[in-house]
């Protein structure tokens, strides 16, 4: 592998990898990336499906390979049985275990020292989770996402991390402070890989130098589904397309929305076209009783009995859009190139149902039947089938009321920005300022305001069109 002098910090790592029989293609070299930090580039043309690197599974940094692994798995299995703790997300628990592993290996005499020494301050993403002052994001949906993530991480720290350290007398003094844990969590989350069901989330030396970007992966990890970590099975990093020499080689972020990527990596990926605005707080503030009843009802609604399910609703979307919509189908948000999410549409229909049938007992069978009637109008309207819409004028009337309710929610959501009434177009003009550098936080904030306002304004224009469209020939 070719390296320039300023990247001598990687030399001990490369020697350690060679000692453990890892393979790094001689066509690769490490250099400063135009995206973030360091990256891996090609010195020669690389063919499709060419192996770029192989790392033995026994040397990846994972709770499975760590001397602390047994005590971690025992602690987390016991915590999972506790009535006071409920972490049913496997990736969340896997991340917490990996973060604890990294903290312990980093402050003790570790076999991964050669790798851990490369994770200096230049590797730390400028994640908004670590920003001391977040007032510049006040009113944005992005800030809601950030605060939600912080609450989740703090909850994990209080309920899982501290109890683990304090349970073991020899580890108690090593328990990280909350800020130290959060910093390590941000670093690890930005660099870890899902290996397989046995190893889960892990740090893979060298592989994590490859930068990410949205869209199809240029190269990606491949690992057999096996728990044989004592053998010489290797994890491979393979090119998925032809790569020209002197090009940076990217892994893919996966299919995530812009808010998810920003909180994890600390920059706006221009290739990511999927933005969301969360409408949950506005829905709650507008009518708390409706919202709280919806929270209860949505748990018992059998979506398979609905005319359109979360899966079919997202079938004709792009891969990223479809992935985001299916992962969180019942969340209340507005999304790029689509408008209201599946869950938000159902909530709107539910609210109109409540207004019409205030004194009636809300039977789930009736509610499902009502949803299907409205969905029939919704689909016919979206597909321009005027005859079907006219044939269901009663349903169309309810549909229009739901759309009007959405318009009101959008107006209220825009008022939360507290930005003096600036429009998306005004922010677009500000973004043309040549003095704003790509990595400048001010530019990031302007981009967030622009995309979120643009999404809300377009959604409002769409609702006006839907409610005023003339169906006469």
Swiss-Prot record:
UniProt xrefs under PROSITE patterns: SET
CDD domains assigned: SET_LSMT (cd10527)
GO molecular function, one term: protein-lysine N-methyltransferase activity
InterPro entries assigned to the protein according to its UniProt record, in alphabetical order: SET_dom (IPR001214), SET_dom_sf (IPR046341), SETD3_SETD6_MTase (IPR050600)
Annotated ranges, domain SET: 26-254
GO CC field: cytosol; nucleus
Superkingdom: Eukaryota
SUPFAM superfamilies in the cross-refs: SET domain
GO BP term (any one): ribosome biogenesis
SMART domains cross-referenced by the UniProt entry: SET (SM00317)
PANTHER family given in the database record: N-LYSINE METHYLTRANSFERASE SETD6 (PTHR13271:SF34), UNCHARACTERIZED PUTATIVE METHYLTRANSFERASE (PTHR13271)
Protein name: Uncharacterized protein C16C6.01c
Organism annotation: Schizosaccharomyces pombe (strain 972 / ATCC 24843) (Fission yeast)
């Amino acid at each position: 592998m070719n390296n320039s002098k300023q990247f001598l910090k990687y030399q001990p790592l490369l020697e350690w990898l060679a000692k453990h029989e890892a393979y790094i293609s001689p066509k690769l070299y490490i250099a400063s990336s135009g995206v973030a930090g360091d990256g891996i580039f090609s010195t020669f043309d690389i063919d499709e499906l060419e192996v770029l690197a192989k790392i033995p599974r026994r040397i990846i940094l994972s709770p499975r390979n760590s001397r602390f692994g047994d005590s971690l798995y025992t602690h987390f299995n016991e915590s999972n049985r506790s009535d006071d703790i409920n972490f049913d997300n496997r990736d969340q628990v896997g991340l917490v275990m990996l973060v604890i592993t990294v903290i312990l290996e980093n402050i003790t005499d570790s076999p991964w020292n050669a790798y851990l020494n490369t994770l200096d301050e230049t590797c730390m993403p400028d994640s908004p989770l670590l920003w001391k002052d977040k007032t510049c994001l006040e009113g944005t949906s992005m800030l809601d996402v950030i605060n939600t993530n912080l609450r989740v991480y703090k909850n994990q720290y209080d309920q899982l991390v501290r109890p683990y350290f304090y349970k073991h007398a020899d580890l108690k003094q090593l328990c990280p402070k909350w800020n130290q844990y959060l910093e390590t969590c941000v670093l690890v989350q930005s660099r870890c890989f899902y290996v397989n069901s046995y190893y889960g989330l892990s740090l893979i030396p060298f592989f994590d130098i490859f930068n990410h970007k949205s869209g199809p992966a240029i190269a990606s990890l491949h690992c057999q589904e096996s728990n044989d970590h004592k053998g010489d099975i290797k994890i491979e990093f393979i090119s998925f397309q032809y790569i020209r020499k002197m090009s940076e080689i990217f892994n893919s972020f996966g299919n995530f929305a812009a808010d998810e990527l920003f909180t994890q990596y600390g920059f706006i990926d221009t290739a990511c076209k999927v933005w969301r605005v969360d409408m949950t707080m506005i829905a709650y503030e507008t009518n708390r009783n409706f919202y709280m009843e919806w929270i209860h009802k949505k748990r018992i609604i059998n979506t398979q009995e609905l005319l359109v399910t979360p899966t079919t609703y997202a079938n004709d979307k792009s891969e990223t859009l479809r992935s985001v919509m299916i992962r969180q189908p019942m969340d209340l948000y507005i999304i790029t190139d689509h408008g209201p999410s599946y869950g938000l549409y159902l909530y709107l229909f539910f609210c109109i149902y409540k207004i019409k049938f205030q004194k009636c007992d809300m039977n789930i069978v009736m509610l499902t039947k009502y949803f299907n009637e409205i969905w029939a109008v919704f689909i016919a309207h979206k597909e321009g089938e005027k005859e079907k819409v006219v044939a269901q004028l009663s349903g169309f009337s309810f549909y229009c009321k739901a759309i009007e309710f959405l318009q009101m929610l959008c107006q209220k959501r825009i008022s939360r920005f507290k930005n003096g009434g600036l429009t998306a177009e005004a922010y677009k003009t500000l973004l043309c300022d040549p003095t704003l550098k790509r990595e400048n936080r001010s530019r990031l904030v302007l981009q967030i305001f622009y995309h979120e306002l643009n999404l809300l304004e377009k959604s409002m224009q769409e609702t006006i069109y839907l409610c005023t469209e003339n169906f006469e020939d």
